Amino acid sequence: EALSYAACTADETDECLQMDEKCQVHDSLFWDRWHKLNYRSVRKTFEYMKTAPVTEVWIDQSLEKAWNTTWIPDSLRSFRPVFQQLYARMPAEWQETEKGKLIESYAFPAPTVEEGDDMADGLLYDAEGESHHLSELQGRYILLDFWSIYCGPCRMSEPEMEEIVHLYGDKLALVGISNDEKISWSKFLKEHKMPGYQWKEPKNGGRSLASRYKAGGIPHFVLISPEGKILKMWTGYRKGILKSKLKKFISEDTIQ
């Protein structure tokens, strides 16, 4: 039954994507509908997992659904106590595995941040393997872009990101944070010139920057002030939205 709900989510998502422009990926109508379907799928899956045998399949399902308890809307965060109970069912030796530790990070995640809060920071690395932190960019506005190679709207935003990098110069640091596998991400960066800094974070589950900034959908953008305060967070892309958002926070007299 849980799997049928998951299939329903996938089928209706495809249907939604084929609808008119009012229900495109970057639109709130799409995400509202997707979240409702996903909620039903997660609820059914977790109910089954309460009594199902703890096997490799059970572990993999835990990881697949875990991120839903972390950064998607408040209704899904209500599942976190249930997920903590599921984690407690895991044998101790499984909790010590790489997957077990990742599941534990989702069961007991780091707190998320909101607009007005100090920025969250963490370990990032570039394509050469060099370590970085967002703090090294303080003193400038920082625009975080959580994205993926396979995300259509993410790729659509690239020309406008090129524009804002040129427009704001050293007043703004654009930081792309990919959720792709390291090999495919590195290969892509070698073949495509991407704007700004292109970094990636180690797999850290519920304690990742993606989790802390609630990047449940992509592209997900976060604008940070030179003082390290979160000014604005939003999900989705449509032409002109980046310039429109930045213009509200960065005065024109700062532009080169």
What are these model-derived regions, one by one?
Residues 1-132:
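Oxidative protein folding and maturation machinery
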Residues 116, 137-138, 168-169, 191-192, ...:
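A structural signal for short secondary-structure junctions
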Residues 123-125, 175, 189-227:
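Short, internal strand/loop/helix patches
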Residues 138-139, 146-163:
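Conserved redox-active cysteine motifs that mediate thiol-disulfide chemistry
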Residues 140-142, 219:
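Alpha/beta-hydrolase fold active-site loops
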Residues 144, 185, 198:
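Hydrophobic, well-ordered secondary-structure elements that form the walls
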Residues 155-192, 204-211, 244:
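Structural microenvironment flanking redox-active thiols in thiol-disulfide oxidoreductases
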Residues 217-218, 229-254:
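Non-catalytic, surface beta->alpha helical segment in thiol-disulfide oxidoreductase systems
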